[in-house]
Amino acid sequence: MKSMEEFTEEIGDTSFVSVRGGGTRWNLGGPLTEGTIIVEAPKGVINYKPEEMIVRVGAGTKLSTLQDDLIELKQEVALAGFPESTVGGSLAVGSSSHRRARIGAACDVLLQADCVGADGKQFVAGGPTVKNVTGYDICRLLVSSLGTLALMGVVTLRTRPKPEIGVWLKGELDFEEIANYCYRPASVLYDGSKTFVFIEGYEADVEKEKAFLEKMGMTVMDRALEIPPLQKGATKEDLNGGFLDLQTGAVYSNDTNSNIEVSEEVQRLSNRIKQNFDPTGRLNPGRKPY
């Protein structure tokens, strides 16, 4: 496994630089400036602490590999991605699961990040437990920043119990009716004509909720719903064959043309944060989180 020292040396302290993960969302945020050096983050699981529900892993590790390993411990991390997506890449793009309403967002997963800053020096944000809040806000800034504030090498993530079972149903119930019969459904998605519900948890609880929904006219699906990527900034007018999350307002679609509109105040704040972290603009130059 590549060490943090080797990772730091590759990044240096002067050239334009970017970390490439699985490349599954590589064009998100705009093209890189020509001449940018491409490096890779350390790969591999460093340490599991299932009793404390944390795992320490190289940011270049495939998310699917980590999730497969955690299955044996009956745990998971609340991140989503493609088969080739890396842990660091999923954090950098803020790839929350369609189950976000139940299991939390990507920004809730990252407890500690061992990073290299724009000055070419290592620093640590956050800590291995939530009680240690020093630098924890920096972790939340790093998620969805597209690597424009710092480059993550090793991360400590919060894990959670993996549900015993999960079931997809579809029908024409509205959200209010579903909420009356389900306690914290994992997903309630709408494609413009039908509603799709994913319930998960202990088997007895899921079977009870499933029976209620079937009684109200919903039918069990024989396979999991195929959900396209989360498109930040998209609205219900941008479905284009995708899905609207009725619980969070998120849109999942293969249409990548959505533009995120932010207020001038938010943009000024974003620019000020970027200036403080990377005054020369050498980290992922050309990328814009908004």
Predicted regions, residues:
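A common structural junction motif
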Residues: 73-77, 180-186, 211-220, 243
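Conserved glycine-rich FAD pyrophosphate-binding loop
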Residues: 29-32, 192, 211-290
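FAD-binding subdomain of flavoenzyme oxidoreductases
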Residues: 84-189, 195
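Glycine-rich beta-strand-to-loop/alpha-helix junction loops that act as flexible
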Residues: 19-25
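Helix N-cap motif at beta-to-alpha junctions
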Residues: 172-174, 199-207, 235
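Hydrophobic side chains in well-ordered alpha-helices
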Residues: 7-10, 66, 174-178, 206-209, ...
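N-terminal glycine-rich flavin-associated loop
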Residues: 1-19, 39-82, 95-128, 163-170
